[in-house]
Amino acid sequence: MSVGALETAPSFESRRRVVGAKLGRYQVGPRIGVGGSAAVYLARTTGPMSSEEFVAIKVVHEHLSEEEEFISQFRDEANLLVRVAHPNIVRVKELGRENDTLFLAMEYLHGQPLSKLASTLARRGAHLDSVLVAWLGARVAEGLAYAHELTDDQSEPLALVHRDVSPQNVFVTYQGEVKLIDFGIARAAGRIVQTTLGRVKGKF
């Protein structure tokens, strides 16, 4: 999986086929997660000028694609998140739209969320070493510090806040990287979270 805690939700593919489709320069593969506002798919870049690369594609559910307020906030937040470039935060590559399908292309992470690693160890009667936990926490703190200090082109703070820094949103890759995931969720618990200009709020 490549993005945070994705809860089970009804499939939206009955009316719109996504698997096998081409969204922009991406060929969409299998679905790897689904949440309340979007589903996530494994995809790869295509085209003669593109080096083949696997990415995670977050596709907004069809019923939300028709909500003007949601789409406006989604675009604003995506455009801010594209600016974020830090080794301890998942990289958002681009926001795109193909016909009526709105999507976000992100770095694909091959690994497991920290919550799953901890639960796997617990089932085996083990636990994460305290030194390792401290190291993981330091990497998360570095990512958060960068996000909190990020500014726009006028050097004004963007006030990017995660608000759900939890084990399911800390991803550890098989290469030993530590990545914060699931920034910028604007819709939660069936409501629109109001944001002010230049401010992104995470999950509540």
Regions found by a protein language model. Give the residues of each.
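Activation segment signature within eukaryotic-like protein kinase domains
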Residues: 136-137
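Activation-segment/catalytic-loop signature of the eukaryotic protein kinase fold
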Residues: 95
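Conserved short submotifs of the Hanks-type protein kinase catalytic core
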Residues: 99-113, 117
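Protein kinase glycine-rich loop
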Residues: 28-35, 40
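AlphaC helix of the eukaryotic protein kinase fold
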Residues: 61-83
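Protein kinase catalytic-loop region centered on the HRD/HxD motif
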Residues: 142-160
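AlphaC helix of the protein kinase catalytic domain
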Residues: 114-128
